[in-house]
Amino acid sequence: MALLEVRALRKDFPIRRSGEAVHAVNGVSFDVEPGETLGLVGESGSGKTTVGRLLVKLLEASEGSIVFKGTDITRLSARAFRPFRASAQMVFQDPADSLNPRLTVADAIRGPLVSLGHMDSRAQQARVRELIELVELDERNLPMYPHQLSAGQQQRVGIARALATRPDLVVLDEPISNLDPMVRVGVLNTLRDIQEQTGVAYVFISHDLSTIEEVSHRVAIMYLGEIAEMGTTELIFARQMHPYSRALLSSVLYPDPDVVVPRFPLVGEIPSPINLPRGCFLAGRCPLADEHCRMVHPDLREFEGGRRSACHHAEDVAAFKATHAENTVDSH
């Protein structure tokens, strides 16, 4: 049984003056198994961070279900969700903003343990020391305040705080994007080690494809609030079956000379999330699009190996030979 089952998830943000809405998440469905990492990747505005916040009920869903450990948490009140809070945590993009500047490292990590209400002071202190070691910090950091730490140390504190209650799921929202390259490597290695030791599952949100490839067991690529393509990391990076996936990967320069993704142009404006097209959201930019694409919205269909693609021409994507000079996912 999956740890997390997301079905037809939607999130709209109403615009009061016009009566319209920003359609941020549009019918997203996926599972997360215990101990796995699902990489959620997309450009700015794709809806990936909104999905992450929905998973831990920092936002309320407009429609759909999020079944976590057998319970649909979208139907729970804040009070009813409280027992699940310990099992689903989030690490945020900017560690400085997510840490209270008035709390020491020890107090920041201890906070979730206090909220649990069933650990005495000695047990809390022991758990804090255990967590500091787990995220590869030193006990000398415990009395420090956030401003006395480096960005990498701050993010490690954020990770320790998220792990304090022994969660089954941690949503990582761009956890290394604000860090220096060498620090990123260290934090990623720590996250991998923690997963191996604890069996925690991650939803790893990022715009960085190389990072997603490195850390994820499976990948879901998002475009305009929906999943364009999803599958194992190996399948997605070896051969794409959605035009947006192929364009996204072909726009990335890989340090490995053996990794070559043929050019694939997407030309034109990205549709407004307020007035989404009737058919495929990519039809106005895709060289494979026809009248059927413009009129009928594609479902996320399953293919060999468990891969899924929301494209009417999924089988033709890999074979398409680009003849255009453009090679970018956001050319206008």
Language-model segments: residues:
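P-loop NTP-binding/switch modules centered on Walker-like glycine-rich loops
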Residues: L179-V261
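Conserved catalytic motifs of ABC-family nucleotide-binding domains
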Residues: R166
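Conserved ABC transporter NBD signature motif
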Residues: G64-D72
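Conserved ABC ATPase signature
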Residues: Y145-L149, Q153
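Conserved ABC ATPase "signature" region
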Residues: D72, R122-R140, D193, L249-S250
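Short catalytic/signature loops enriched in Gly
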Residues: R16, A21, T232-H332
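ABC ATPase NBD coupling module
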Residues: R17-G19, I73-Q89, D107, S115, ...
